């Protein structure tokens, strides 16, 4: 299926490894130019950039802390200067708040908000004017299953917060031919092999008894970014093996 992404530009945060790197390469295979960033792992990001360039696309790869509004603005400006546009923004950069509420402390709480909520805020504030200018855009945010399963108060708060942000944004930008959607992955393996070897690690009540494959999430991203998803907005797609039914 033709996604219509060839020649478009996808900006992806948290793109140095795991789901972020897989997403970057998935978009590159569709012919999309890339603007990718990481807050720390520049060596890994450089490797992703080289793999993407080998697929024939242009790449801007930068160190960028999404909690820093000025840094995000500079990253988006460089993307526009070098690639001319931003059509798709995928907010993958995240902070995992794993502590129980009474054990994690305020620092973990504020860090979770800064990366998982303020980060997408900065990205969207900077890319939306470019999308509005071209009257086309796709915002894709990443949530999870914690809001639905009660997986830790801090984690559940930020993951549900991004769902609310996505839905509110979807209403505000719809008149500009821009969609905003969310994906809620379950436990995702780093490879198809790991996904099939993980039956003992997944929740006992999960119908599909394995971790998800990265491509089972990136395929949803590609659909939501495609021309064919222009009538889909404000949704949260749960890709979780049935751990939670919505």
Question: Which positions does each model-derived feature cover?
Answer:
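Conserved glycine-rich Rossmann-like NAD(P)H-binding loop of the short-chain dehydrogenase/reductase
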Residues: 32-47
């Amino acid at each position: 299926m033709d996604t219509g992404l060839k020649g478009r530009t996808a900006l992806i945060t948290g793109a140095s490894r795991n789901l972020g790197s897989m997403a970057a390469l998935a978009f590159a295979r569709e012919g999309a130019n890339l603007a990718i960033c990481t807050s720390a792992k520049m060596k890994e990001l450089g490797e992703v950039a080289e793999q993407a360039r080998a697929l024939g696309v242009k790449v801007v790869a930068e160190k960028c802390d999404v909690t820093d509004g000025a840094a995000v603005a500079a990253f988006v400006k460089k993307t526009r200067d070098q690639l001319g546009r931003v059509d798709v923004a995928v907010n993958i950069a995240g902070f995992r708040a794993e502590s129980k509420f009474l054990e994690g402390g305020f620092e973990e709480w504020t860090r979770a908000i800064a990366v998982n909520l303020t980060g997408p805020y900065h990205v969207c504030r900077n890319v939306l004017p470019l999308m509005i200018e071209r009257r086309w855009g796709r915002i894709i945010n990443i949530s999870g299953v914690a809001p639905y399963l009660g997986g830790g108060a801090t984690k559940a708060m930020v993951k549900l917060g991004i769902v609310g942000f996505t839905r509110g944004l979807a209403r505000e930008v719809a008149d500009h031919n821009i969609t905003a959607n969310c994906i809620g992955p379950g436990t995702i393996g780093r490879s198809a092999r790991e996904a099939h070897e993980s039956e003992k690690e997944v929740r006992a009540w999960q119908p599909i008894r394995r971790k998800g494959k990265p491509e089972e999430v990136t395929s949803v991203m590609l659909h939501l970014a495609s021309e064919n998803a222009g009538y889909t907005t404000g949704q949260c797609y749960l890709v979780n093996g049935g751990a939670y039914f919505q």
